[in-house]
C-alpha cells in the first residue's frame, strides 16, 4: 500500500472529547442531529451503510440527465444545503478552512494499490506541498473534500482501490462515541473505522452506494463488519486510530469517478438511533410435506453408483478455485485426505479452476492461437496426486471445474471461442484419465455457471454444457459426468429441464436454505450484519426487534423480509419441501440427483443451531436417498478443526472414526 502525506498522530480528538463530556453531561438531552435537518434540506434523506458490493464505483453520471452520459468528475456539486453537525460528539472535519489539516489536528493522507501491482491513481489537483485539499462546493457550505480517481487493476490480483483518511489518537475518552455521520456525493465507497486491535488489515467497515445527489451517511458502530479474511476482533471505539474512505473498483474494467465528502462527525452514543420493535413473535408455520415411495424412486443403475460413491462427501475449499488459485504448493494434501477418510467421509470434491493451467488461454479465446496448450506438469501433479491419495484411502474423487473469477459470464457465454476453450480444457483432462480403471472418478462440468451474477440463462448454459459433454465423450465414454443448472445449481431450473441424451450423467443441486441462517455474518453477502438466527425457528428465541438480529437501516429489504418470515422457512420441513422438487424430477426422468454443496457459516450462529441444521440436512438426504457432499473441509464452513472432527458432527452427519 502506498501512503502519501502521512503525519504523526496527535491527541486533539481526545482533548475535544474530554471537553465535550465536561461541558455536556446530560446524555439524554440531545437528539440525533440527523433527525433535525436545517430548513431546505427536507429532500436530503439520510442513508445508512449499505451491504451492496462497493465493486465498481459508477462512471460519473450527470444527476439532472436521464441518460448515462459521463461528465467531468470535477463538476461542482450544486445540491444543498447539507446539515452542520452539532451535539455531544466531535467534528472530525468540515473542510471550511480549505486546507489539509482536520479539526482533530491531523492531516489527511492518501493511499492506493500501486505497491501491490495496481495502477489506480487519485487525480485531484494537489496543493504546492502535494497534499490533497478540499474543493469548492455549493451545498450550503464552502468546501468539501474532493477526490477524483481512476481505478485500474494493473497487475494487482484483486479489486483495485484508492483511499484517503485521517489518523485519530486512540484514547479511553473516545469510548463514548457510538457512530459516525458524514455527507457525500459521488461513487460507491467504503468507510473504514480502523482500530489498533486489528493487525491484519481486516478493518471494520460500512459500505455505501453511489449517489449523484448529496446524501447523509449514518454509521452505527454496532453495525460495522469486518472484511472477513482475517481475525475477528470486537470493535472498541476507545481504540480508533484512523477514519478512512476507500473507493474500490472491479477487476474487469477501468473506472473513473469522483467522491465529495463533507461534515464528518463522530456521534456520542446518546445521539445514535436506537432499534425499535418492528416484528411479531409468531408460532412456527411448518409445511406439510407428503410423497409416496414411487414419487422418489430412481431405478437407473447410476442411482446406486451415486449412493455408493458420492454420499458423505466433503469439499476442499478456498484453495484451487480462487481467482489467484493456480497451484503453488500442497496447502492440502495426503494427510488431509486421510483425516477425512479416518472420520468416515467417503468422497472428496476438489474445486479447481482448470483453465488457469491453459498457458495460452487468452490468445486461444482471441482466436490468435488455434491450439490450446497446458501446463501439464503442474495441472496433473495436482490431479494425479489426489487421484492416488483418494484411491489409497477409499474415497471417490470429483474433479470440479470451479471459477471464482467468474470468467464464464453473460459476455463470455456468447463467445464461441470461450465455449470452445472450456470444452478443450475438459477434453484435455478427460483424455488424461480415459484409461483410468477407477469408476469412482467423476468430471463436474462447471460449478455454478456465472457464479457472481447468475444472469446466464439455462438455455445459454445448456449450449456450453453440451459442448463440454461432447468434447469429453470424444476421448472418454466411461467416466460419469456431473451437471448442475444455472443460477447457482438451481432446483427450480433443474425441475424444468429436459435431461441430456447422454445416459452417464448425474445431476446436481446446491442448497443453502434457509439462507438467513446459513449465511448470517457472511461478509460477501447481504447478511453481513445478521447474527443469532436460530435453527430451527423457535418463538422462545425470537424477538420483536429485528435489530436484535443485526438488521439495520442499511439491510436490504429482501433480507428484512426473509428474517420477518423466518417463522415459515426456518424448519426441516421447509427445506425438505424444496429439495423434494428436485427428487421428484429425478424420479420422473429416472436419473440420479445429488447435493454437493450445503453448509452453514460458523460466524454468527450457535453450535447447537448448526448441528440442528446439519442433522436436518442429513435426515432429508437419507429419506430421499440423495447423496450429499458438505461445503467444506476447513474455514468458516468447516467439519474439521485442528485435525479433528468438530464435536457433534458424528451424530449430525452420521460419520465419525471407525
UniProtKB/Swiss-Prot annotation:
Gene Ontology biological-process annotations: cellulose catabolic process
Prodomain positions: 24-265
Lipid moiety-binding residues (N-palmitoyl cysteine): 24
Main localisation: membrane
Keyword set includes Protein biosynthesis: no
Compositional bias annotation for Low complexity: 45-58
Lipid linkage positions (S-diacylglycerol cysteine): 24
Gene3D superfamilies: Glycosidases (3.20.20.80)
Region span, Disordered: 42-83
Reactions catalysed: Endohydrolysis of (1->4)-beta-D-glucosidic linkages in cellulose, lichenin and cereal beta-D-glucans
Family to which this protein belongs: Belongs to the glycosyl hydrolase 5 (cellulase A) family.
Keyword Lipoprotein: yes
Quaternary assembly: Monomer.
EC number(s) reported in the record: 3.2.1.4
Native species: Fibrobacter succinogenes (strain ATCC 19169 / S85)
Entries under PANTHER family matching the protein: ENDOGLUCANASE, PUTATIVE (AFU_ORTHOLOGUE AFUA_5G01830)-RELATED, GLUCAN ENDO-1,6-BETA-GLUCOSIDASE B
Name of the protein in question: Endoglucanase 3
The protein's role, per its UniProt record: Exhibits both endoglucanase and cellobiosidase activities.
Top-level EC class: hydrolase
Signal peptide: 1-23
Domain of life of the native organism: Bacteria
Amino acid at each position: 500500500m502506498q501512503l502519501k502525506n502521512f503525519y504523526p498522530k496527535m491527541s486533539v480528538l481526545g482533548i475535544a472529547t474530554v471537553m465535550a463530556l465536561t461541558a455536556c453531561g446530560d446524555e439524554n438531552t440531545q437528539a440525533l442531529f440527523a433527525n433535525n435537518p436545517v430548513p431546505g434540506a427536507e429532500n436530503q434523506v439520510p442513508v445508512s451503510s449499505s451491504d451492496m458490493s462497493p465493486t465498481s464505483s459508477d462512471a460519473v453520471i450527470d444527476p439532472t440527465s436521464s441518460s448515462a452520459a459521463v461528465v467531468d468528475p470535477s463538476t461542482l456539486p450544486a445540491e444543498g444545503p447539507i446539515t452542520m453537525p452539532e451535539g455531544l460528539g466531535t467534528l472530525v472535519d468540515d473542510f471550511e478552512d480549505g486546507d489539509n489539516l482536520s479539526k482533530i489536528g491531523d492531516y489527511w493522507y492518501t493511499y492506493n494499490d500501486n505497491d501491490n501491482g495496481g495502477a489506480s491513481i487519485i487525480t485531484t489537483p494537489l496543493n504546492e506541498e502535494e497534499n490533497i485539499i478540499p474543493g469548492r462546493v455549493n451545498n450550503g457550505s464552502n468546501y468539501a473534500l474532493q477526490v477524483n480517481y481512476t481505478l485500474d487493476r494493473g497487475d494487482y490480483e484483486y479489486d483495485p482501490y484508492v483511499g484517503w483518511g485521517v489518523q485519530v489518537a486512540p484514547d479511553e475518552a473516545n469510548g463514548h462515541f457510538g457512530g459516525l455521520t458524514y455527507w457525500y456525493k459521488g461513487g460507491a465507497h467504503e468507510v473504514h473505522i480502523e482500530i489498533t486491535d486489528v493487525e491484519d488489515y481486516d478493518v471494520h467497515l460500512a459500505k455505501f452506494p453511489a449517489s449523484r445527489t448529496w446524501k447523509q451517511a449514518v454509521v452505527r458502530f454496532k453495525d460495522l463488519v469486518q472484511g472477513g479474511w482475517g481475525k475477528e476482533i470486537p470493535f472498541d471505539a476507545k481504540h480508533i486510530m484512523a477514519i478512512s474512505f476507500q473507493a474500490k473498483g472491479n477487476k474487469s474494467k477501468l473506472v473513473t469517478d469522483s467522491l465529495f465528502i463533507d461534515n464528518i462527525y463522530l456521534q456520542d452514543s446518546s445521539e445514535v438511533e436506537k432499534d425499535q420493535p418492528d416484528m411479531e413473535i409468531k408460532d412456527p408455520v411448518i409445511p406439510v410435506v407428503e410423497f409416496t415411495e414411487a414419487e422418489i424412486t430412481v431405478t437407473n443403475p447410476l442411482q446406486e453408483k451415486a449412493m455408493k460413491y458420492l454420499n458423505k462427501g466433503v469439499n476442499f475449499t478456498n484453495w484451487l478455485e480462487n481467482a489467484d488459485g493456480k497451484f503453488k504448493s500442497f496447502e492440502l494434501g495426503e494427510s488431509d485426505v486421510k483425516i477425512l477418510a479416518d472420520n468416515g467421509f467417503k468422497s472428496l470434491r476438489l474445486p479447481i479452476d482448470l483453465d488457469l493451467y491453459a498457458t495460452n488461454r487468452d490468445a486461444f479465446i482471441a482466436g490468435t492461437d488455434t491450439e490450446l496448450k497446458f501446463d501439464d506438469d503442474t495441472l496433473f501433479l495436482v490431479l494425479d496426486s489426489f487421484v492416488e491419495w483418494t484411491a489409497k484411502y477409499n474415497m471417490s474423487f470429483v474433479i470440479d471445474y470451479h471459477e471464482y473469477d467468474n470468467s464464464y459470464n453473460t459476455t463470455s457465454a456468447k463467445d464461441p471461442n470461450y465455449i470452445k476453450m472450456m470444452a478443450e480444457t475438459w477434453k484435455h483432462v478427460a483424455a488424461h484419465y480415459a484409461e483410468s480403471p477407477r469408476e469412482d472418478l467423476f468430471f463436474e462440468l462447471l460449478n455454478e455457471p456465472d457464479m457472481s451474477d447468475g444472469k446466464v440463462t439455462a438455455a445459454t448454459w445448456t449450449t456450453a454444457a453440451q459442448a463440454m459433454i461432447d468434447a469429453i465423450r470424444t476421448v472418454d465414454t466411461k467416466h460419469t459426468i456431473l451437471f448442475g443448472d444455472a443460477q447457482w445449481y438451481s432446483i427450480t431450473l433443474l425441475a424444468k429441464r429436459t435431461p441430456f441424451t447422454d445416459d452417464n450423467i448425474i445431476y446436481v443441486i446446491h442448497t443453502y436454505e434457509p439462507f438467513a441462517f446459513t449465511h448470517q455474518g457472511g461478509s460477501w453477502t447481504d447478511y453481513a450484519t445478521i447474527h443469532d438466527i436460530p435453527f430451527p425457528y423457535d418463538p422462545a428465541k425470537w424477538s420483536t426487534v429485528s435489530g436484535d438480529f443485526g438488521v439495520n437501516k442499511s439491510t436490504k429489504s429482501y433480507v428484512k423480509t426473509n428474517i420477518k418470515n423466518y417463522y415459515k422457512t426456518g424448519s426441516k420441513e421447509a427445506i425438505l419441501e424444496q429439495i423434494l422438487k428436485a427428487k421428484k424430477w429425478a424420479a420422473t426422468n429416472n436419473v440420479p440427483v445429488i447435493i454437493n454443496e450445503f453448509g452453514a457459516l460458523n460466524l454468527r450462529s450457535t453450535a447447537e443451531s448448526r448441528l440442528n441444521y446439519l442433522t436436518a440436512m442429513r435426515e432429508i438426504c437419507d429419506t430421499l436417498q440423495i447423496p450429499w457432499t458438505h461445503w467444506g473441509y476447513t474455514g468458516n464452513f468447516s467439519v474439521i478443526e485442528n485435525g479433528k472432527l468438530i464435536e457433534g458432527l458424528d451424530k449430525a452427519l452420521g460419520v465419525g472414526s471407525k
